[in-house]
Curated annotation (Swiss-Prot):
The EC number(s) this enzyme carries: 7.1.1.9
Residues that bind Ca(2+): E39, G44
Top-level lineage group: Eukaryota
Subcellular location field: Mitochondrion inner membrane
Cofactor: heme; Cu cation
Catalytic activity: 4 Fe(II)-[cytochrome c] + O2 + 8 H(+)(in) = 4 Fe(III)-[cytochrome c] + 2 H2O + 4 H(+)(out)
Record's keyword annotation contains Cell inner membrane: no
Described function: Component of the cytochrome c oxidase, the last enzyme in the mitochondrial electron transport chain which drives oxidative phosphorylation. The respiratory chain contains 3 multisubunit complexes succinate dehydrogenase (complex II, CII), ubiquinol-cytochrome c oxidoreductase (cytochrome b-c1 complex, complex III, CIII) and cytochrome c oxidase (complex IV, CIV), that cooperate to transfer electrons derived from NADH and succinate to molecular oxygen, creating an electrochemical gradient over the inner membrane that drives transmembrane transport and the ATP synthase.
Identification of the protein by name: Cytochrome c oxidase subunit 1
Organism: Ostrinia nubilalis (European corn borer)
Binding site for O2: Y243
Gene of this entry: COI
Listed GO biological process terms: electron transport coupled proton transport; mitochondrial electron transport, cytochrome c to oxygen
Amino acid sequence: MSRKWLYSTNHKDIGTLYFIFGIWSGMVGTSLSLLIRAELGNPGSLIGDDQIYNTIVTAHAFIMIFFMVMPIMIGGFGNWLVPLMLGAPDMAFPRMNNMSFWLLPPSLTLLISSSIVENGAGTGWTVYPPLSSNIAHGGSSVDLAIFSLHLAGITSILGAINFITTIINMRINGMSFDQMPLFVWSVGITALLLLLSLPVLAGAFTMLTTDRNLNTSFFDPAGGEILFYIQHLFWFFGHPEVYILILPGFGMISMLFHKKEEKKKHFGSLGMIYAMMAIGLLGFVVWAHHMFTVGMDIDTRAYFTSATMIIAVPTGIKIFSWLATLHGTQINYSPSILWSLGFVFLFTVGGLTGVVLANPSIDIALHDTYYVVAHFHYVLSMGAVFAIIAGFIHWYPLFTGLSLNPYFLKIQFFTMFIGVNLTFFPQHFLGLAGMPRRYSDYPDAYISWNIISSLGSYISLLAVMLILIIIWESMINQRMILFSLNLTSSMEWYKSKLPPAEHSYNELPILSNF
């Protein structure tokens, strides 16, 4: 048994490991977010120590991004579905695939260790010096966090190499690039983004480590360096990273809309591919919109504003293509379609607040306020997470051979929908009123919206517990899937046996072009 999991080279087993790891990390991250909302539910102090509060905020961000969304989307769905959708026997490098999973638990262990030794890493996920330098954060906490991110980065780079090689070399005969499913495209583009952006982060963090431990002065003004040089390096990684988090979600939502609505093809499939490529490319040239407040030249600001707004064009193409795919169908409100519709609506809201923040004069007022928190949580907490749950419900019968209870799933969807909106919508008002991020206390004027926001987080907690109960119920009752209701145009459902056998295909499939 232990050999099956520890030494596995099977993409389905490794994908399952990623899912288990991601769900567990997601529960840790959710617990941390509830601590944050408990602290902010009322003015005054609950935790009592702001360093601990900042450590919780930092750990919440890192865990949700690197140990929940990325392992589930790229590691879980990517490993399970890409080989099946390509008709490949497995991934290109199965043993490397196993290694890239088993580097993640040590990485998470290091991150949690960084929070519980010394004073914890209370730097925020951006890890800016001088706060992250050895003056403000002496001791080993920040070093442990950096080492943890190095490991997570190695994991992602290895995974990216594996996906790119698999997609280029292991398609079945006759499958051209434009015939690949949109989810495979989205994972491929995501892998390319990871491969290009993570080395920059590794370089920045290595320089920060030597500044802290080896007396160099890469980011130290005393050594004649520019302090915000690290911000350029960090955000050159950090902005593509947010597209890395959402692109596989785009692919999943595209698959869901045309499979669940029984369309043979998605509307504007080629346009969707080009839109994802454009988003990936533009994601690399807009990083400084996170840094409007460092004091930039007017021409630089004009460039980053326009470039940021241009990203809205391919994103708009995707949203209207999804709506066009739905057009003319009798919408079947199955749980996964509810999540997908929720994704489209809430992701659009998050995107619109992003266009607001792209304007430097507005951003200077709103930078580091709760308006920014609301913006990126609409995109991540209601974009990435909704896509994950939609995909999980849709492909759960493929992964397990079991069915979930659709009635409970609908109750859970509406609970979660109300919970997340009640949590994050009021934060727009708090931000416009000037409440800053990363503070554990606030003036009494902000109390009403904070109480509502914290109430929403408790409802979201109930929803998370509900979906865990629904999955547990399905596994206890073992309601087997007798036959797949999906069209044969989707190759992952091709086998009559669910879940697929250890070797997916006895012989490689043939693609017929009519």
